[in-house]
């Protein structure tokens, strides 16, 4: 084996052979002769004229330059993207005035979300663009993640908000001084019914997926109120809520979410909520909640509470959750009655719901005006029942047996009771969309001054005509908000089956839209004071009358 010193000598000799004119001493070469002076280290300068090396170096240089150019191009693209995001962020935060782009994200931001046993419906992402340069139009752009993009001139104008997907666009036009309705006389609320049918023939000359809706005006609901800022024609929607109810909502709803859900109950019946959602999509074939009304709720919350977009995102999820809850309750046959209120008077009513609730007769002229729209409804077959009355002292008194007459109101209509000058009670119903009713029972007896509550079971499916109550100890409960009339008379001859009017002296109990009452004593006193012709043989429990 060669030693380390021998190896160093061999390397030194090899280097000297390569450059005989310029002897080179390696850095680690050690001179053994102490008398010989050490050689100075020389810098080796190689002048190589080999063209292959030059070509190789040139290719390396070109590769590095191309890589740098690619990095520079990516940086420029990133800078352009940042600028675009900055501009969109400025639009969202209202830093620019034309146009103002406000995102209204509803439901899951990624569309459909799936768990182990549940599949939520696809909730659209909604963007509202207020463009003052296009006749003060409000453009509500609804993104459908399940569809492909379709070319459209209007879509191309407003497609910068969420690129790469098809947008179902709803153009909401603010009515001018002489343009409170559409050309065909259709009101804003009626025009909004075509929103769920985007792409249908109602949107000609606009696009296959664009529908023009005119914001309604005060003439649509003269007795109603504004949702949103009534002084801003772009941020308000007229609704059928009467001023007293709106004042009640504003007073009792301390949070934006509570107000949104309360407004939802006032504006959409629970039956409508059960078969609808925000997107109008899903495996159950649900319909879409009126976007104009939802936009009104949004305007109202922004105006009253100054909520942020994240708050509105959460509220939209709560609205969808409320609709799913109503759907599940309907599938189980449970009550859809609203516990917080029971008055649902149509906007065309000529008198208030409080007068209707207690049977107070309206003025004769108003009654005559409402009669052409009212259809008399005959009572069903009589059935003997026992009526229990709870006195002021809390004692339960059994009224002698009488006849109970039950009339189910057809779906989509509302019951009203009026009293003529001769004291006859007329039972009729007035149409109102999206309502249905049922009579439920609780097999729980009355005990003391309270009534035990249980989940009611439906006695017959919706759509039946009459119901015969079985004799026994079944507790019959007309749920709060139920538009079903049950009249009990002590006179068996006063059947009223043929539609003949029942005398007030024969009526012991009547059911009509009842306000929530928790004090039975006050309820009985109020009923006796306002209706002296009717015996206060009733018990009010959470807005319902319990009889046996």
From Swiss-Prot:
Consequence of substituting residue 349 to A: No effect on TP53 activation
Entry comment describing in which tissues the protein is expressed: Highly expressed in heart, spleen, and thymus. Isoform 1 is highly expressed in kidney, brain and testis. Isoform 3 is highly expressed in kidney and lung.
Pfam family, one: BEN
PTM annotation: MAPK1/MAPK3-mediated phosphorylation at Thr-345 and Thr-360 results in export to the cytoplasm.
Coiled coil: 65-98
Site positions for Required for TP53 activation: 347
UniProt-listed GO biological process terms: chromatin organization; positive regulation of DNA-templated transcription
Residues joined by cross-link Glycyl lysine isopeptide (Lys-Gly) (interchain with G-Cter in SUMO2): 141
Region (Disordered), start-end ranges: 174-206, 335-368
Ranges of compositional bias, category Low complexity: 343-354
Protein name: Protein BANP
């Amino acid at each position: 084996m060669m030693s380390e010193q021998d190896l160093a000598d061999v390397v030194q000799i090899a280097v000297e052979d390569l450059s005989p004119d310029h002897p080179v001493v390696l850095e680690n070469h050690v001179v053994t002769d102490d008398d010989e002076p050490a050689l100075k280290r020389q810098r080796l300068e190689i002048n190589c004229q080999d063209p292959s090396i030059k070509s190789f170096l040139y290719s390396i240089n070109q590769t590095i330059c191309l890589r740098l150019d690619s990095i520079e191009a990516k940086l420029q693209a990133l800078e352009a993207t940042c600028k675009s995001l900055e501009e969109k962020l400025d639009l969202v935060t209202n830093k620019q005035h034309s146009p103002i782009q406000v995102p209204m994200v509803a439901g899951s931001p990624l569309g459909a979300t799936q768990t182990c046993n549940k599949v939520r419906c696809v909730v659209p992402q909604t963007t509202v663009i207020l463009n003052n340069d296009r006749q003060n139009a409000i453009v509500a752009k609804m993104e459908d993640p399940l569809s492909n993009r379709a070319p459209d001139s209007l879509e191309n104008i407003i497609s910068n908000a969420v690129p790469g997907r098809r947008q179902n666009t709803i153009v909401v036009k603010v009515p001018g001084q002489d343009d409170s309705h559409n050309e065909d006389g259709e009101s804003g609320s009626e025009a909004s019914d075509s929103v769920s049918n985007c792409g249908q023939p109602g949107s000609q000359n606009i696009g296959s997926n664009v529908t023009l809706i005119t914001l309604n005006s005060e003439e649509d609901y003269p007795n109603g109120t504004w949702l949103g800022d009534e002084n801003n024609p772009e941020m308000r929607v007229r609704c059928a809520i009467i001023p007293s109810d709106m004042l009640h909502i504003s007073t009792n709803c301390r949070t934006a979410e509570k107000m949104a859900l309360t407004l939802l109950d006032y504006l959409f019946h629970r039956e409508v909520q059960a078969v609808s959602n925000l997107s109008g999509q899903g495996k159950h074939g649900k319909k879409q909640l009126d976007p104009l009304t939802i936009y009104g709720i949004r305007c109202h919350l922004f105006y009253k509470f100054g909520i942020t977009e994240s708050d509105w995102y959460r509220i939209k999820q709560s609205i969808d959750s409320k609709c799913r809850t109503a759907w599940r309750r309907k599938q189980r046959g449970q009550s859809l009655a609203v516990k917080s209120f029971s008055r649902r008077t149509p906007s065309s009513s000529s008198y208030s719901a409080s007068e209707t609730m207690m049977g107070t007769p309206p003025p004769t002229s108003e009654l005559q005006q409402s009669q052409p729209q009212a259809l008399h409804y005959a009572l069903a077959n009589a059935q003997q029942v026992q009526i229990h009355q709870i006195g002021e002292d809390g004692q339960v008194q059994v009224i002698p047996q009488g006849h109970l007459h039950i009339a189910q109101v057809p779906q989509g209509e509302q019951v009203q009771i009026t009293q003529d000058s001769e004291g006859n009670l007329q039972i009729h119903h007035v149409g109102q969309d999206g309502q249905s009713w049922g009579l439920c029972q609780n097999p729980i007896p009355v005990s003391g001054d309270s009534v035990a509550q249980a989940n009611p079971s439906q006695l017959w499916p919706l759509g039946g005509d009459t119901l015969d109550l079985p004799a026994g100890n079944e507790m019959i409960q007309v749920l709060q908000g139920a538009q079903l009339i049950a009249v009990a008379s002590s006179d068996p001859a006063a059947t009223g089956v043929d539609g003949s009017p029942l005398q007030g002296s024969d009526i012991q109990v009547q059911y009509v839209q009842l306000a929530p009452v928790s004090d039975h004593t006050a309820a009985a006193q109020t009923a006796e004071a306002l209706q002296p012709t009717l015996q206060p043989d009733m018990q009010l429990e959470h807005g319902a009358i319990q009889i046996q």
